[in-house]
């Protein structure tokens, strides 16, 4: 199933498709989630349990990392691993073969690290990642749009000789219900403010929030509200997860092909409704002879 997924999963949006592009760049987002698996000894040994406030969680968990096309919400590449694997480690395996020039990749503050940033930059993709507020980014040159240039270094580079220049965008969401949580800092390798103004990148970053719903779609809506994967061995859990990713891709592809001829952004269509329509049509498809 993994080999099939690697052949099938891909970006779908043609150039100019509504909601999929920013100044000629295909907008992508990186995000991860965890899924409960059946509480069997083999699954527990392979995937592991997350910690809990008292003891451990009731179920082992698999960690899933996905690269998502923002305009269509299709997962274009994925990595599946035991719970103990960090998202940064998984991303270091996933990104070199999947990021391409012409992409603009968004990611939240849990992903940034100098080594992963360097790996992602080497792909030729452009990046706009949120970073934690305690990351030291001294101002080196203030740009006309209020962003500024700084240099990031590997923490192991004691002599600070092999840094990379980044552009830093600081902003605060106004009139928010949670003002103490709404200070944002982005770093990007789009260094020219004329090509990507700070205000536009700040607005674009919040497209990333939408893809958090992608994992909800195949964790909940695609599985009829079942919260635990049914497979009882690690190999079958992996097959089940890749199968879910393929099913999600097929549904999202159908939604995109329904929206684009009408000039619509696929975001305007309901994933839940699409699943219901497909379920109604499946008996008809099964009746067609091969």
For each of these PLM feature ranges, what is it?
Residues 2-8, 17, 22-26, 30-290:
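Single, function-defining residue in the core of a domain
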Residues 14:
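Glycine/small-residue-rich loop that forms an oxyanion/phosphate-binding "nest" at active or ligand-binding sites
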């Amino acid at each position: 199933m993994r080999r099939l997924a690697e052949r099938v999963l891909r970006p779908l949006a043609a150039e100019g498709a509504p909601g999929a592009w920013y100044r000629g760049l295909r907008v992508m987002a990186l995000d991860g989630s965890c899924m409960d698996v059946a509480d069997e000894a083999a699954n527990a040994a392979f995937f592991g349990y997350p910690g809990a406030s008292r003891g451990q969680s009731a179920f082992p968990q698999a960690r899933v990392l996905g690269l998502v096309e923002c305009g269509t919400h299709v997962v274009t590449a994925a990595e599946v691993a035991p719970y103990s694997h960090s998202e940064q480690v998984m991303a270091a395996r996933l990104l070199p073969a999947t990021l391409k020039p012409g992409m603009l990749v968004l990611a939240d503050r849990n992903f940034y690290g100098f080594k992963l940033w360097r790996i992602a930059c080497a792909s030729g993709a452009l990046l706009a990642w949120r970073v934690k507020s305690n990351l030291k980014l001294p101002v080196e040159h203030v740009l006309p749009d209020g962003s500024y240039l700084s240099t990031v270094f590997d923490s192991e580079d004691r002599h600070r000789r092999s840094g990379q220049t980044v552009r830093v965008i600081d902003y605060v969401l106004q009139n928010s219900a949670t003002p103490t949580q709404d200070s944002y800092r982005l770093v990007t390798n789009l260094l020219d403010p004329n090509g990507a103004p700070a205000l536009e990148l700040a607005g674009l970053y919040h497209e990333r929030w939408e893809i958090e719903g992608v994992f909800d779609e195949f964790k909940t809506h695609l599985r009829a509200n079942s919260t635990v994967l049914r497979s009882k061995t690690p190999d079958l859990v992996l097959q089940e997860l890749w199968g879910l990713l393929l099913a999600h891709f097929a549904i999202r592809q159908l939604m995109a092909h329904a929206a684009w001829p009408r000039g619509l952004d696929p975001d305007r269509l309901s994933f839940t409704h699409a699943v219901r329509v497909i379920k109604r049509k499946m008996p008809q498809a099964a009746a067609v002879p091969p």
